[in-house]
């Protein structure tokens, strides 16, 4: 089966056979063989050969190809949404919004490129100072499974726009979405070798990251994999490495007037996408006392009614499945471990259907757990921590090695200003769901959440490097020579 796309042609992988499954039905959706190290090298060479021609195209010519890609996405919107839904388990309504985000990324990337990495010039004495930007060359893009269309797109589009060529390795859990996305690029008229697709798992990724022919690597995924890549790139300052990883994100709730609005925002923060967004709230900080008790009682009551189901279920559920049975079992194990160490169940996370990766929302009070693990539990399990004062809440929020997102629900602007000042995170929200982000803003974190290479609107920054020039149309002597130099 031809599942790799290299140098403008589909070919079969020569490595290990693997499959993609629907997380609920366990039906096989895609089968193929992984790329071998030799095929990885071939893809990098193809990208290298295509780089000069692509980089030398005018910006407008590259934009035209990107806009044709957007048109192809629109034409295949229903097909792509269905593909995302069946392979990730997310409901069709959410898959459709992901396709919309993929389309919108084109115009946003063009605007960002012009604003952040365009050309600028101005007079400087008898010369002109000019700032331009150049592409790095061949970049590898590693995509995650939670947004298998949108998040790789967030690297690939700005990389191609800047003039780079790309070798794309998607998650081994979502190869079908990647294949369909690449077909949209082919329909757009992207030249051979400019974008190459390598399917495979860990071994394929290691081979690509280690290939000396790449000039950079852009990654979205887990902290564990990101840490491994960072170590692999140690001592290689000539390579650009952009890491966007997860977080153990805190959401503080102050004593607000509108409890219903608070409950709604907590649910949207913790359980959307079955808790599989890197900005999902993992820790909910609630004040001690009667008001906090009432909030939690209402949160548990509403969360217990959340509809969970298959991606194409009608009426549509709010939550679909997690990505795999393995992921579901790991989350259930994490819940059991927390309970064994002193946590108290407020709403048990359950697997309602044996053999399916569906999980119901879980809420547990971990206040009594002496040493809470600072881990990103990537699913619908919300940990509650009760606090006695606002200063203590901020300290607890910052008690993590991560620094992706942090949020506050409060009627007090003064408290938000205090929270914003002391929060150590790249995304800080006030009275909005933690998973909300503006397309015109950067996306990234500090600490174990990234390496200061914010993506989204700031992706242009790591897709090209600045070149500063002093230019004059003719070579002339200055009006005054430097002391100590005599010309006869």
From Swiss-Prot:
Pfam families: Aldedh
Record carries keyword Methyltransferase: no
TM helices/strands, residue ranges: none
Pathway per the UniProt entry: Amino-acid degradation; L-arginine degradation via AST pathway; L-glutamate and succinate from L-arginine: step 4/5
The entry's keywords: Arginine metabolism, NAD, Oxidoreductase
Catalytic center residues: 244, 278
GO terms classed as biological process: arginine catabolic process to glutamate; arginine catabolic process to succinate
Catalytic activity of the protein: N-succinyl-L-glutamate 5-semialdehyde + NAD(+) + H2O = N-succinyl-L-glutamate + NADH + 2 H(+)
Keyword S-adenosyl-L-methionine: no
Single GO term (MF): succinylglutamate-semialdehyde dehydrogenase activity
Record-linked PANTHER family: ALDEHYDE DEHYDROGENASE-RELATED
Function summary: Catalyzes the NAD-dependent reduction of succinylglutamate semialdehyde into succinylglutamate.
UniProt similarity note: Belongs to the aldehyde dehydrogenase family. AstD subfamily.
Protein name (database record): N-succinylglutamate 5-semialdehyde dehydrogenase
Protein source organism: Pseudomonas savastanoi pv. phaseolicola (strain 1448A / Race 6) (Pseudomonas syringae pv. phaseolicola (strain 1448A / Race 6))
Organism lineage string: Bacteria, Pseudomonadati, Pseudomonadota, Gammaproteobacteria, Pseudomonadales
Gene: astD
């Amino acid at each position: 089966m031809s599942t790799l796309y290299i140098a403008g042609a589909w070919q079969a992988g020569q490595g290990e056979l693997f499959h993609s499954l629907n997380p609920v039905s366990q039906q096989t959706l895609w089968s193929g063989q992984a790329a071998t190290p030799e095929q990885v090298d071939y893809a990098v060479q193809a990208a290298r050969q295509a780089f000069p021609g692509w980089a030398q195209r005018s910006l407008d010519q590259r934009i035209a190809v990107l806009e044709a890609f957007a048109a192809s996405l629109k034409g295949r919107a229903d097909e792509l949404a269905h593909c995302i839904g069946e392979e990730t388990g997310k409901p069709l309504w959410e898959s459709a919004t992901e396709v919309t985000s993929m389309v919108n990324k084109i115009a946003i990337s063009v605007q960002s490129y012009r604003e952040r990495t365009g050309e600028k010039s101005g007079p400087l004495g008898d010369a002109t100072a000019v700032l331009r930007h150049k592409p790095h060359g061949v970049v590898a893009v590693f995509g995650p499974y939670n947004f298998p269309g949108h998040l790789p797109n967030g690297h690939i589009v700005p990389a191609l726009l800047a003039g780079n060529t790309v070798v794309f390795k998607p998650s081994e859990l979502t190869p079908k979405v990647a294949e369909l996305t690449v077909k949209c690029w082919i329909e757009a008229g992207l030249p051979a070798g400019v974008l190459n697709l390598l399917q495979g798992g860990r071994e394929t990724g290691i081979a690509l990251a280690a290939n000396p022919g790449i000039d950079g690597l852009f990654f979205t995924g887990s902290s564990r994999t990101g840490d491994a890549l960072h170590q692999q790139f140690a001592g290689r300052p000539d390579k650009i490495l952009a890491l966007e990883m997860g977080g153990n994100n805190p959401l503080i709730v102050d004593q607000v007037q509108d409890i219903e609005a608070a409950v709604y925002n907590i649910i949207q923060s913790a359980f959307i996408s079955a808790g599989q967004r890197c900005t999902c709230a993992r820790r909910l900080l609630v004040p001690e006392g009667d008001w906090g008790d009432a909030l939690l009682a209402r949160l548990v009551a509403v969360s217990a009614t959340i509809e969970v189901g298959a991606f194409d279920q009608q009426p549509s559920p709010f939550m679909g499945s997690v990505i795999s049975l393995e992921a579901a079992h790991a989350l259930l194990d994490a819940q059991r471990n927390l309970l064994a160490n002193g946590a108290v169940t407020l709403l048990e996370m359950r697997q309602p259907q044996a053999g399916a990766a569906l999980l119901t929302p879980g809420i547990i009070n971990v206040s009594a757990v002496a040493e809470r693990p600072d881990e990103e539990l990537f699913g619908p399990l919300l940990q509650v921590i009760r606090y006695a004062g606002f200063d203590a809440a901020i300290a607890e929020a910052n008690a993590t090695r991560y620094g992706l997102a942090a949020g506050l629900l409060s009627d007090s602007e003064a408290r938000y200003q205090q929270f914003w000042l002391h929060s150590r995170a790249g995304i800080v929200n006030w009275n909005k769901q933690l998973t909300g982000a503006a397309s015109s803003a950067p996306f990234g974190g500090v600490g174990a959440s990234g390496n200061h290479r914010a993506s989204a609107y700031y992706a242009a920054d790591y897709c090209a490097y600045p070149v500063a020039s002093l230019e004059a149309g003719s070579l002339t002597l200055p009006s005054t020579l430097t002391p100590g130099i005599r010309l006869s």
